[in-house]
Swiss-Prot record:
It comes from the Bacteria. This is Large ribosomal subunit protein uL2. InterPro entries: NA-bd_OB-fold, Rib_uL2_dom2, Ribosomal_uL2, Ribosomal_uL2_bac/org-type, Ribosomal_uL2_C, Ribosomal_uL2_CS, Ribosomal_uL2_dom3, Ribosomal_uL2_RNA-bd_dom. Pfam families: Ribosomal_L2, Ribosomal_L2_C. NCBIfam families: rplB_bact (TIGR01171). Residues 212-276 are annotated as: Disordered. Keywords: Ribonucleoprotein, Ribosomal protein, RNA-binding, rRNA-binding.
Amino acid sequence: MAIKTYKPYTPSRRFMSVLDSKDITAKSSVKGLLTKLKATAGRNNNGRITSRHKERGAKKLYRIIDFKRNKYNIEGKVVAIEYDPYRNARIALVVYPDGDKRYILQPSGLKVGDSVIAAEGGLDIKVGFAMKLKNIPIGTVVHNIEMHPGAGGQLARSAGMSAQIMGRENKYTIIRMPSSEMRYILSECMASIGVVGNEDFINVSIGKAGRNRHRGIRPQTRGSAMNPVDHPHGGGEGKTGTSGHPVSPWGTPAKGYKTRKKKASDKLIISRKKHK
């Protein structure tokens, strides 16, 4: 997928780039698969900001995606590739012989006219097919991986992402995550074959503040530009550096400090991600 750039007619256009949308074939979305999501803008039920630098953004409707892929042994046909405002990957509209319509994440290489199928048993290894991890050959790249059987895919769902099946041990399959983390996942969990499409999304340059405002991202103020009452880095005459290690507004060390709490599932992690 090509990246489209612009001539610098204005300063904001100079570094801005967008994805070419020639791969999008749909003129409109399926009404029955659209729903509204309440925009919280980073506020909780008391109206207080719990996540900074967020706002409403442009109005959009949520597309209901079939992450479970639980329509087994029925072949569906891809009739459209669509844009989804809630994710950076494209979505594919699949129509089944009984008239059922579902959206799935579009893997790289899946196009209009292709057939997809999901099954609890074994299938051919083709892009867009979904099956249980125990039936997928070692070395295959997969996406939309479940963490609990029947819960729906939760891993490797964004544009260009994929995980690789590295081996099996008892009732578990060993997966190498996009972060290079190695972990066990129950072999009864479902996964889809292939790499999530729209891989060039990572190369897009936002270029101007207005595009981020449309995405619901507000400006972020540096702590060193604040007063001491507002941030540990605040205060001082002129551009004063921080004393000690950088911290968050609440004093938690920044830049690599581990804040993840221990979980029962830690025993399923074989090795952590490798830092570049």
